Amino acid sequence: MTTILKHLPAGQRIGIAFSGGLDTSAALLWMRQKGAVPYAYTANLGQPDEDDYDAIPRRAMEYGAENARLIDCRKQLVAEGIAAIQCGAFHNTTGGLTYFNTTPLGRAVTGTMLVAAMKEDGVNIWGDGSTYKGNDIERFYRYGLLTNAELQIYKPWLDTDFIDELGGRHEMSEFMIACGFDYKMSVEKAYSTDSNMLGATHEAKDLEFLNSSVKIVNPIMGVKFWDESVKIPAEEVTVRFEQGHPVALNGKTFSDDVEMMLEANRIGGRHGLGMSDQIENRIIEAKSRGIYEAPGMALLHIAYERLLTGIHNEDTIEQYHSHGRQLGKLLYQGRWFDSQALMLRDGLQRWVASQITGEVTLELRRGNDYSILNTVSDNLTYKPERLTMEKGESVFSPDDRIGQLTMRNLDITDTREKLFGYAKAGLLTASSATGLPQVENLENKGK
């Protein structure tokens, strides 16, 4: 069976991930007119720039959908977001600022939950608005086929017939008007935005040029912290975790994780926390650039890692970072539910997150400027009395340290021998000043 359909399968049911925007509206109407039977599925991901979800399925029906469903994905999205925090599943960082993989998390949830809903309706052909140059086309492909092995893919933007007729936004708008729908194109921004409850991605158009900065972006989850005219008073916030799960903000407990994430977004968003500018490597190995917002994820991540460093030992923390980066890359590639990802997730959640219980107090200022004011946990292995510089009882004596340092003589001797061995091989040059071989000035190599 052919998995990807290059042309519209007339007479068959086609599920379309319907956002209500111009692209999917025109595609749905066009498919109906060409003889297909479109079913519209809209994911409620708590997008901060969407204020009326119920209106989206109604519009789909007006444009010719056989049926239209709104699928509430918020609970599952937040659950996956918390799992990513527990595992440190983030691999794109620049200058200490993190991209929290909010779009890949949204695709993992959308790609599985919408296809599951389609399967319930007997719809086994799926279309969405992803383009052939991006990451989403592969993410949706993987998650769709994982959920429904009989699934076939039809994307209008891969169909030359659709492209020839409605290849641009102007053509789509004219098509909608000609069909009796007063659909005007929205005012074109200098960039494109995609969002869900966990974060927002701003990319493309002017942001493809590296001389366009964050200053052209109008945040939808935070504030323009770079604008000195925007008043942002400092604010103290306390975050509490129990066994790796965020349960309270400023002393207020939450039985609903969705409400907790919304409050975390509000707190972090007041300061512009979690906004970053990243150059990343797409799945196809081409580089792209994005401006990201994730105020709630950033707030929880900072508090979580503060507790992590105070509770776990050095090697466990090293494995958390190493495995977290591996897992983050798998998540980015659309492999969040693959066996290798599940293996990493299980280890990190079972042996690392389960011990993260405690409370962290921070002072948030502008953007990513913050201070940690206090860290409290019954699980802390940080014990100031063990290494105090003041006179008092200690868990080891000066003689103990002398013995420990003496044991280092063996590897120091080995290292000296290696350095002189490298010098004999011509890899290092001797230094009259220190008596130790040194790396030769590369500019003089071979002269």
From Swiss-Prot:
Q: Which UniProt keywords apply?
A: Amino-acid biosynthesis, Arginine biosynthesis, ATP-binding, Cytoplasm, Ligase, Nucleotide-binding
GO annotations under biological process?
A: argininosuccinate metabolic process; L-arginine biosynthetic process; urea cycle
Report residues binding L-aspartate. 131, 135-136
**What are the subcellular locations of this protein?**
Cytoplasm
- InterPro entries referenced in this protein's UniProt entry, alphabetically: Arg_succ_synth_type2_subfam (IPR023437), Arginosuc_syn_C (IPR048268), Arginosuc_syn_N (IPR048267), Arginosuc_synth (IPR001518), Arginosuc_synth_CS (IPR018223), Arginosuc_synth_type_1_subfam (IPR023434), AS_cat/multimer_dom_body (IPR024074), AS_multimer_C_tail (IPR024073)
Any idea of its EC number? Answer: 6.3.4.5
Q: In which pathway does it act?
A: Amino-acid biosynthesis; L-arginine biosynthesis; L-arginine from L-ornithine and carbamoyl phosphate: step 2/3
So where does ATP get bound?
17-25, 43, 129, 131, 136, 194
Pfam families found in the cross-reference section = Arginosuc_syn_C, Arginosuc_synth
GO CC terms for this protein? cytoplasm
Binding residue positions for L-citrulline: 99, 135, 139, 192, 201, 203, 280
* Reaction catalysis annotation: L-citrulline + L-aspartate + ATP = 2-(N(omega)-L-arginino)succinate + AMP + diphosphate + H(+)
Entry annotated with the keyword Amino-acid biosynthesis:
yes
Q: Name one GO molecular function term.
A: protein homodimerization activity
Q: What is its main location?
A: cytoplasm
* Stored PROSITE patterns: ARGININOSUCCIN_SYN_1 (PS00564), ARGININOSUCCIN_SYN_2 (PS00565)
Enzyme class, top EC level, equals: ligase
Quaternary structure, per UniProt, is: Homotetramer.
PANTHER family referenced in this protein's UniProt entry, alphabetically? ARGININOSUCCINATE SYNTHASE
Which NCBIfam families is this protein grouped with? argG, PRK05370.1
Family statement drawn from the similarity comment of this UniProt entry: Belongs to the argininosuccinate synthase family. Type 2 subfamily.
What protein name is recorded for this chain?
Argininosuccinate synthase
**Source species, please?**
Salmonella newport (strain SL254)
